Amino acid sequence: SSIPLFIGFVKGGIPLGVTFAFLITSPLVNEVAIALFLGAFGVKITVIYAVSGILLGMMGGAVLERFRLERYLSPWIRGLLVQSGEESGAWERKGTPFRKRWAVIMHDAWEIVKGVALYVVIGIAMGAAVHGYVPEGFFEASMSREHWWAVPVAVICAVPMYANAAAIVPVIQVFVAKGVPIGTAIAFMMATVGLSVPEAALLKKVMTWKLIWIFFGTVTAFIILSGYVFNILIAP
């Protein structure tokens, strides 16, 4: 999960729009997913996917930055921000060397792990439960080529799922082989990796529900747009 890194970025004073751009992009575009994509779909589709994933993160982060959403971070993370600021200020005033900061750094890291561990377990359990109950052939029937609404349906169907990009690439390869348009399949992949109920369970530790809804709504809109653009650019 990218959540601990997201927390670290926020604690480090990095603007929230930049941290959101990281949160969106990091699960979508990574070396394993790109390698699998290259083998499954070739250079052209891989390049378009990688560029669109990066642009999705950049645009999503830029839009979310304009909303000034810091006030919607959870009380837990805001408490960590205050504590971190006080510690950093004291270290700078005293010129504390790095080796003497190590114990505090490890303590803070452990507090973050303890804070999100339960939510990680809940998210994984929810994803596993959904994987076990989805009927065979359901997704292919819902995302067939003749339906104009296939892209938003693909995104909605992906929300209960939970998987990383490397795990989902073989799945969308099967979808495409069974006639699902490539843009629709990739929208499903992006939503599975970047948007899901288990992901919301993880984010609840660091965000209020209002911020989660804003984040999910913004990213959903961009993923649906990306799916339609893919279907236009890579029409059969």
Name what the model sees in each region.
Residues 51-151, 177, 213-236:
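Selected transmembrane alpha-helices and immediately adjacent juxtamembrane segments
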Residues 1-50, 131-211, 216:
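Membrane-interfacial helix-loop connectors
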